[in-house]
């Protein structure tokens, strides 16, 4: 594999985010636990009234307990109370995208504030930099991947209501046609299929409501509605996974695993008992159109079911299956998608380690042809010494939409949808260079190598190599002492 030289661009960036309101933290869905010791998930103390803090006795190892009504904290763990139950608590770290679970110990950068009966949370991630994709089909672009997600939680009647929104400026900050990403496929631009590009996310990524009611001391029943929203299909969406927290690129397996995370019309209901969650969705399975600023109206004729399992604070697993009716505008035909994933998170002294293994399979039928496409992802991010990150993503994926008509002519291929097994291997690092009580600024870079059938060499080159250099802004990590001072 040829060696690559590139000039590292230096950017001066000044970001001031001072807030006179005390906030705490929680990322797109995660909250870091500074100590590795996992405390049992206790019930809120019946004697603790909302807004109280119970100090442990002098010299005691017992963790501090705080109770602010809807929001309960015990030691290093944060919980959301369901209704008025003293025992039915949801770990905040477990709350993933849509109705997904992730390990409860997952780090979660966020800003939060208690406002009357409401618990308000603000999550965002802003990444900008240079994206260089290698080989004859690669280009170099300056771009920004970003999202902002406010949410609000309060008691309503016998249960707890969560309102969530999510927005992205990518329709304005991605290059025309999408972010360059070698071997990526899915969706369209100007009526043509996107190839070697990742489409921008919609301006409106999620507008949802989730209402959960306790059933006894250990269970709850919930209903989730989103327009747009995320059905019960696939793992935690890639931009919310702690294992991919520093990786700015979508997986090449995105459209075999978690591409339904923006669906214009979703209703999900399910039942959660202790470590298990069983849920089903009725939703619109059509991928968002090229107009990234509107609300789309398509039939809610797709369905899915998912079983999730979280045996302790450091593990979460899911298996799901769904029928998507005509998801692609240019390829009429249904897709039956099956996914399975395992996520692990381990906090340790001055750091955290998050990893995921994900498999997705599309059984597709187009114009009388049947395709079985598989995607495998292994990704991991380790944070160490407070501000340093190393990360990787290794994936193998089947692609059958890589070739245009002129490409097939060049390669002498007559098959309309030839399938190729593609490998992508990303290695990168980042470092926080400036932290305040509210904001964290980091710089980072990664490099990606590929494997592919040699028949693709005339159009992709023998050994293409891609790289990125970026600046990342998000809420800063917080300490427990700072959180105690918040209230």
Give names to the regions the model predicted.
Residues 120, 157-162, 217-221, 275-279, ...:
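Repeated loop/turn-to-beta-strand initiation elements of outer-membrane beta-barrel proteins
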Residues 122, 126-130, 163-169, 223-227, ...:
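Transmembrane beta-barrel strands of outer-membrane/channel proteins
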Residues 118, 140-148, 201-207, 261-267, ...:
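Residues that define the transmembrane beta-barrel architecture of outer-membrane proteins
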